[in-house]
């Protein structure tokens, strides 16, 4: 399992991020910290090694950026993803200078959170896979692309235009409805697993956006809705 530490002084936000982490296979939250002092105690003194840190910038009496040089000088092996409402160029520049692996601006979509963690894991595994790389492999590792990269809107293997058309036609007919994977899968009579693959692709194409809701049991449910500014793209796949 990949051990994640969440640093945020807002208890509700920290809990929400903890639940996000719990939804991604292979990741677990091993602690939360509301102060940098508590965070350093966990990072440097805990028996559990921290693989990934989710770091807020704006804290009540502290600035999360102050932790980055501490980690850098200590040659800490934990990687950092910033999750913050800080969107100014200076803060982002300082964060990147200290090697943060990703930067999410609040509020963010659940799919973007999942992309950040799984993308980081993919690069980490790739770095541990080989001792040497050729240029194409290095390009893929650093840029996430290659010289012959395909159109990101091309359907991945296993997805069919016919099924996509059926899903998009249903979504088009329910433009004002925020739906779950289970609801759509039942309506168009396909498996939940297959339906989720299409929905993830539509989110990656910016046709849909996601939000997360919690029922009385506390179980998170992802819900989807059309992004109005990209409605024309959805209509293309309805033909």
From Swiss-Prot:
It is found in: Cytoplasm. One of its GO terms (cellular component) is cytoplasm. InterPro entries: 2C-system_Tx_regulators, CheY-like_superfamily, Sig_transdc_resp-reg_cit/mal, Sig_transdc_resp-reg_receiver. GO terms for biological process: DNA-templated transcription; phosphorelay signal transduction system; positive regulation of DNA-templated transcription. Residues 181-200 bind DNA. Residues 3-121 form the Response regulatory domain. Keywords: Activator, Cytoplasm, DNA-binding, Phosphoprotein, Transcription, Transcription regulation, Two-component regulatory system. Phosphorylated and activated by DcuS. The modification 4-aspartylphosphate is found at residue 56. Pfam families: Response_reg. GO terms for molecular function: DNA binding; DNA-binding transcription activator activity; phosphorelay response regulator activity; protein homodimerization activity. Member of the two-component regulatory system DcuR/DcuS. Involved in the C4-dicarboxylate-stimulated regulation of the genes encoding the anaerobic fumarate respiratory system (frdABCD; nuoAN; dcuB; dcuC; sdhCDAB; etc.). Weakly regulates the aerobic C4-dicarboxylate transporter dctA. This is Transcriptional regulatory protein DcuR. It comes from Escherichia coli (strain K12).
């Amino acid at each position: 399992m990949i051990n994640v530490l969440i640093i945020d002084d807002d208890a509700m936000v920290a809990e929400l991020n903890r639940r996000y982490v719990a939804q991604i296979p292979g990741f677990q939250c091993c602690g939360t910290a509301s102060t940098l002092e508590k965070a350093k105690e966990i990072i440097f003194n805990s028996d559990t090694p921290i693989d990934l840190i989710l770091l807020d910038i704006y804290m009540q009496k502290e600035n999360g950026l102050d932790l980055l040089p501490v980690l850098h000088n200590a040659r800490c092996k934990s990687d950092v993803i910033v999750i913050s409402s800080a969107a100014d160029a200076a803060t982002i520049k300082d964060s990147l200078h200290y090697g943060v692996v990703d930067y999410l601006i609040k509020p963010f979509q659940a799919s973007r959170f999942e992309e950040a963690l799984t993308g980081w894991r993919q690069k980490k595994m790739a770095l541990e896979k080989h001792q040497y790389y050729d240029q194409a492999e290095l390009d893929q590792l650093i840029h996430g692309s290659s010289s012959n990269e395909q159109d990101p809107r091309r359907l991945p293997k296993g997805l069919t235009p016919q099924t996509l058309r059926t899903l998009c036609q249903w979504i088009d007919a329910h433009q004002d409805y925020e739906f779950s994977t289970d609801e759509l899968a039942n309506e168009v009579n396909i498996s939940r697993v297959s339906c989720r693959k299409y929905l993830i692709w539509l989110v990656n194409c910016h046709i849909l956006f996601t939000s997360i809701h919690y029922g009385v049991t506390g179980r998170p449910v992802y819900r989807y809705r059309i992004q109005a500014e990209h409605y024309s793209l959805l209509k293309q796949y309805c033909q």
